[in-house]
Design a protein with these regions (language model features):
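Intrinsically disordered, low-complexity, positively biased terminal segments
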Residues: 11, 151-388
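Conserved active-site alpha-helix within GNAT-family acetyltransferase domains
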Residues: 104-108, 114-132, 257-273
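Short amphipathic alpha-helix that is part of the acyltransferase structural core
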Residues: 1-61, 68-75, 142-182, 216-221
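Conserved acetyl-CoA-binding loop-helix of GNAT-fold acetyltransferases
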Residues: 76-81, 86-100, 230-241
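Flexible glycine-/small-residue-enriched beta->alpha junction loops
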Residues: 127-143
Length: 388
């Protein structure tokens, strides 16, 4: 039986998760009931004939930015199954159930942090989020301009910090909007782990960039960094140079398309790209209507293959006039066909139409509509760094 866990079934939830994550049941219980998940999630469970929990995962609701708009998102966490019940298809059935739940709650997107990308592809998820990790020698930062002033930000500055963070993140597809609960949790974490939070201000005393960082030995590790423009980013980089007596290098986590190496004295620094999280579209029609389109185009059609969310498993006719996307559905032969995995990558902007065609992710039935297809799906910055 697949269902939403009751309070009575929580003990079975903790037992199953504790086994899979190698934690005690009490540790799992304390982590969930004292942390940000408490009262903010549903656990989807599979029960055996004795009504014992054999498989479980959580749906954690978030608001996220997509195309500059705030939409609902279902985060998947704690996927667990006891070994005696694996291979029976329970997790697949649970995902199907969860997509019905998300549809009822208007969660347009979903995402997760995979232990194996190939496993979660079976449920329609695909690689949509990557971060870039760079290590910069401290002396490479000496020639950047200083801000008019710098100020350490405290928890009482939380509203200033979060408003600026939202202002920057609304330009990106995927970041979580931190509500009061999540913001308090993050600030408490910074306080408890000796992170410092600083802002850079211009000559009008306006916040133009900010970051949270921690000194570890001779290295500064930056947890978050937000900046209005290139100048304000360089103001932060110079701030780190002021720490040169204690620091040999700075580690930054950046968007994968960030071009920071172009502004450094030498691009030969240590850097790497890490495939981070997977994303999935739960409601295709609603997601298409959210897109911001640069150029109008005539109607063309896309067939989506999605056997776990049958409302997506159809042909969508798409057109754009005056920057507004119009969508209708039918079962005619489509100009393009693809699975929900690759559609999810395309609509987030992790890949563009040309890449999808080149990599044979799309079946093309009408080559005359490729130009319009490329107008709909183009490259964008994606980001999902929230842990869940």
């Amino acid at each position: 039986m697949i269902k939403i866990a009751t309070e009575k079934e929580r003990a079975g939830v903790y037992k199953t998760m504790g086994y899979c994550f190698n934690w005690s049941e009490d540790a799992i219980k304390n982590n969930i009931e004292s942390g940000s998940f408490n009262k903010y999630e549903e656990f989807i469970v599979s029960l055996n004939d004795k009504e014992d929990v054999e498989s479980v995962f959580a749906i954690i609701p978030y608001d996220v930015y997509f195309e500059g708009k705030i939409v609902k998102f279902g985060g998947i966490g704690g996927v667990s199954s006891l070994p005696e019940n694996r291979g029976a298809g329970n997790i697949r059935k649970m995902f199907k159930f969860s997509f019905e739940y998300m549809k009822e709650h208007n969660m347009i997107f979903s995402g997760l942090g995979p232990f194996a990308f190939q496993y979660y592809r079976k449920f329609g998820y695909e690689w949509c989020f990557t971060w870039q990790l760079v290590n910069i020698p401290i002396n490479d930062l000496k020639d950047f301009p200083a801000a008019s002033s710098y100020r350490q930000l405290k928890k009482e500055d939380k509203e200033l910090f979060e408003n600026f963070r939202n202002h920057i993140n609304e330009r990106v597809n995927g970041p979580v909007v931190r509500d009061e609960r999540l913001a308090n949790e993050k600030w408490d974490y910074y306080r408890n782990t000796n992170h410092k939070v600083y802002g850079a201000f211009n000559d009008k005393n306006e916040l133009v960039s900010m970051m949270a960082f921690k000194q570890e030995g001779k290295e500064i590790k930056v947890a978050e960094m937000y900046f209005e423009d290139e100048l304000s980013r360089q103001n932060l980089l110079y701030f780190f140079y002021r720490e040169r007596s204690l620091t040999e290098k700075v580690e930054l986590v950046l968007h994968v398309d960030d071009e920071i190496r172009n502004i450094l004295p030498s691009p030969r620094i240590s850097y790497w790209h890490w495939p981070n999280k997977m994303g999935r579209v739960v409601l295709v029609e609603e997601a298409l209507k959210l897109l911001n389109i640069k150029n109008s185009f005539d109607n063309f059609s896309i067939k989506i293959n999605d056997d776990l969310a049958p409302w997506n498993n159809q042909t969508f006719n798409v057109s754009c006039v005056n920057d507004k996307v119009d969508v209708s559905c039918d079962n005619s032969l489509a100009d393009f066909e693809m699975d929900i995995n690759r559609f999810s990558q395309l609509i987030y902007g992790h890949i563009d139409a040309s890449q999808a065609i080149k990599l044979n992710f799309v079946k093309i039935n009408n080559k005359t509509r490729i130009r319009d297809f490329e107008k709909l799906f183009y490259k964008k910055t994606t980001m999902l760094w929230q842990e869940f």
